[in-house]
Protein backbone atom coordinates (compact mmCIF):
# COMPACT_ATOMS: atom_id res chain seq x y z
CA UNK A 1 0.00 0.00 0.00
CA UNK A 2 1.42 3.39 -0.90
CA UNK A 3 1.61 6.40 1.40
CA UNK A 4 -1.07 8.11 -0.71
CA UNK A 5 -3.46 5.14 -0.28
CA UNK A 6 -2.90 5.11 3.48
CA UNK A 7 -3.58 8.85 3.68
CA UNK A 8 -6.75 8.53 1.60
CA UNK A 9 -8.00 5.67 3.77
CA UNK A 10 -7.25 7.60 6.96
CA UNK A 11 -9.11 10.64 5.62
CA UNK A 12 -12.21 8.52 4.96
CA UNK A 13 -12.11 6.94 8.42
CA UNK A 14 -11.62 10.32 10.12
CA UNK A 15 -14.78 11.77 8.58
CA UNK A 16 -17.06 9.60 10.71
CA UNK A 17 -20.56 8.52 9.84
CA UNK A 18 -22.35 11.00 7.55
CA UNK A 19 -25.45 10.70 9.73
CA UNK A 20 -23.51 11.07 12.97
CA UNK A 21 -25.64 13.85 14.46
CA UNK A 22 -28.82 11.85 13.84
CA UNK A 23 -27.13 8.90 15.54
CA UNK A 24 -26.17 11.15 18.46
CA UNK A 25 -29.75 12.43 18.69
CA UNK A 26 -31.15 8.89 18.73
CA UNK A 27 -28.64 7.77 21.36
CA UNK A 28 -29.31 10.83 23.50
CA UNK A 29 -33.09 10.40 23.28
CA UNK A 30 -32.82 6.72 24.21
CA UNK A 31 -30.72 7.57 27.25
CA UNK A 32 -32.99 10.48 28.12
CA UNK A 33 -35.95 8.09 28.05
CA UNK A 34 -34.18 5.81 30.51
CA UNK A 35 -33.24 8.67 32.86
CA UNK A 36 -36.76 10.17 32.82
CA UNK A 37 -38.22 6.75 33.56
CA UNK A 38 -36.39 6.67 36.88
CA UNK A 39 -37.89 9.96 38.04
CA UNK A 40 -41.34 8.96 36.77
CA UNK A 41 -41.33 5.78 38.85
CA UNK A 42 -40.08 7.57 41.97
CA UNK A 43 -42.89 10.10 41.72
CA UNK A 44 -45.51 7.45 40.92
CA UNK A 45 -44.71 5.09 43.81
CA UNK A 46 -47.31 6.56 46.22
CA UNK A 47 -49.97 6.39 43.49
CA UNK A 48 -49.01 2.81 42.63
CA UNK A 49 -49.29 1.86 46.31
CA UNK A 50 -52.87 3.10 46.40
CA UNK A 51 -53.85 1.70 43.02
CA UNK A 52 -52.33 -1.74 43.56
CA UNK A 53 -53.03 -1.93 47.30
CA UNK A 54 -49.36 -2.54 48.05
CA UNK A 55 -47.33 -1.76 51.15
CA UNK A 56 -44.11 0.25 50.99
CA UNK A 57 -42.10 -2.98 51.31
CA UNK A 58 -43.96 -4.57 48.40
CA UNK A 59 -43.89 -1.53 46.13
CA UNK A 60 -40.14 -1.12 46.72
CA UNK A 61 -39.66 -4.16 44.46
CA UNK A 62 -40.81 -2.04 41.50
CA UNK A 63 -37.59 -0.02 41.78
CA UNK A 64 -35.45 -2.82 43.19
CA UNK A 65 -36.30 -5.25 40.37
CA UNK A 66 -35.34 -2.66 37.76
CA UNK A 67 -32.09 -1.79 39.53
CA UNK A 68 -31.08 -5.45 39.99
CA UNK A 69 -31.73 -6.27 36.33
CA UNK A 70 -29.82 -3.17 35.25
CA UNK A 71 -26.86 -3.96 37.48
CA UNK A 72 -26.69 -7.49 36.10
CA UNK A 73 -26.81 -6.32 32.46
CA UNK A 74 -24.35 -3.42 32.69
CA UNK A 75 -21.18 -5.54 33.12
CA UNK A 76 -22.27 -7.81 30.26
CA UNK A 77 -22.97 -4.94 27.87
CA UNK A 78 -19.54 -4.87 26.21
CA UNK A 79 -19.58 -8.61 25.59
CA UNK A 80 -23.21 -8.65 24.38
CA UNK A 81 -22.69 -5.71 22.02
CA UNK A 82 -19.57 -7.39 20.65
CA UNK A 83 -21.38 -10.70 20.20
CA UNK A 84 -24.57 -9.37 18.59
CA UNK A 85 -23.12 -6.20 17.08
CA UNK A 86 -23.36 -2.80 18.71
CA UNK A 87 -26.15 -1.43 16.51
CA UNK A 88 -28.32 -4.54 16.85
CA UNK A 89 -27.78 -4.69 20.60
CA UNK A 90 -28.53 -0.98 21.00
CA UNK A 91 -31.70 -1.29 18.91
CA UNK A 92 -32.80 -4.39 20.82
CA UNK A 93 -32.20 -2.61 24.14
CA UNK A 94 -34.39 0.31 23.05
CA UNK A 95 -37.08 -2.08 21.86
CA UNK A 96 -37.02 -4.16 25.06
CA UNK A 97 -37.12 -1.02 27.21
CA UNK A 98 -39.99 0.53 25.24
CA UNK A 99 -42.14 -2.60 25.05
CA UNK A 100 -41.58 -3.29 28.75
CA UNK A 101 -42.55 0.33 29.51
CA UNK A 102 -45.85 -0.20 27.73
CA UNK A 103 -46.54 -3.37 29.68
CA UNK A 104 -45.57 -1.68 32.96
CA UNK A 105 -48.25 0.90 32.27
CA UNK A 106 -50.76 -1.82 31.38
CA UNK A 107 -50.03 -3.95 34.47
CA UNK A 108 -53.01 -4.49 36.74
CA UNK A 109 -51.20 -6.32 39.53
CA UNK A 110 -48.04 -5.80 41.51
CA UNK A 111 -46.35 -9.06 40.42
CA UNK A 112 -46.93 -8.18 36.74
CA UNK A 113 -45.57 -4.68 37.29
CA UNK A 114 -42.47 -6.05 39.01
CA UNK A 115 -41.94 -8.59 36.22
CA UNK A 116 -42.15 -5.92 33.51
CA UNK A 117 -39.89 -3.59 35.50
CA UNK A 118 -37.27 -6.37 35.58
CA UNK A 119 -37.59 -6.77 31.80
CA UNK A 120 -37.39 -3.00 31.46
CA UNK A 121 -34.19 -3.03 33.54
CA UNK A 122 -32.69 -5.59 31.17
CA UNK A 123 -33.26 -3.19 28.27
CA UNK A 124 -32.48 -0.02 30.20
CA UNK A 125 -29.27 -1.30 31.76
CA UNK A 126 -27.51 -1.24 28.42
CA UNK A 127 -28.80 2.10 27.15
CA UNK A 128 -26.34 4.57 28.69
CA UNK A 129 -23.18 2.57 28.03
CA UNK A 130 -24.20 1.47 24.55
CA UNK A 131 -25.34 4.98 23.63
CA UNK A 132 -21.90 6.32 24.45
CA UNK A 133 -20.21 3.57 22.46
CA UNK A 134 -22.45 4.19 19.44
CA UNK A 135 -21.69 7.92 19.55
CA UNK A 136 -17.96 7.27 19.97
CA UNK A 137 -17.95 5.04 16.88
CA UNK A 138 -19.99 7.44 14.74
CA UNK A 139 -17.80 10.52 15.22
CA UNK A 140 -14.26 11.28 14.13
CA UNK A 141 -11.80 11.83 16.98
CA UNK A 142 -11.87 15.60 16.62
CA UNK A 143 -15.67 15.72 17.21
CA UNK A 144 -16.05 13.04 19.90
CA UNK A 145 -15.70 15.55 22.75
CA UNK A 146 -18.42 17.78 21.34
CA UNK A 147 -20.72 14.84 20.70
CA UNK A 148 -20.22 13.47 24.22
CA UNK A 149 -20.88 16.93 25.68
CA UNK A 150 -24.17 17.15 23.78
CA UNK A 151 -25.02 13.62 24.92
CA UNK A 152 -24.17 14.48 28.54
CA UNK A 153 -26.26 17.62 28.38
CA UNK A 154 -29.21 15.64 27.09
CA UNK A 155 -28.91 13.06 29.85
CA UNK A 156 -28.57 15.76 32.52
CA UNK A 157 -31.69 17.55 31.28
CA UNK A 158 -33.77 14.37 31.72
CA UNK A 159 -34.42 14.71 35.44
CA UNK A 160 -35.31 18.39 35.06
CA UNK A 161 -38.01 17.74 32.45
CA UNK A 162 -39.32 14.64 34.18
CA UNK A 163 -41.88 14.79 36.96
CA UNK A 164 -40.79 15.86 40.43
Residue locations for each model-derived region?
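Transmembrane-helix bundle of Major Facilitator Superfamily
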Residues: 2-164
Amino acid sequence: MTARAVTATTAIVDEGDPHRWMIALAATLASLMQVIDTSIVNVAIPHMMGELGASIDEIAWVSTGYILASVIVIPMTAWLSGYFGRKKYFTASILIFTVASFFCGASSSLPMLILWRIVQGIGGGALLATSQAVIFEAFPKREVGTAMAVFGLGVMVGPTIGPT
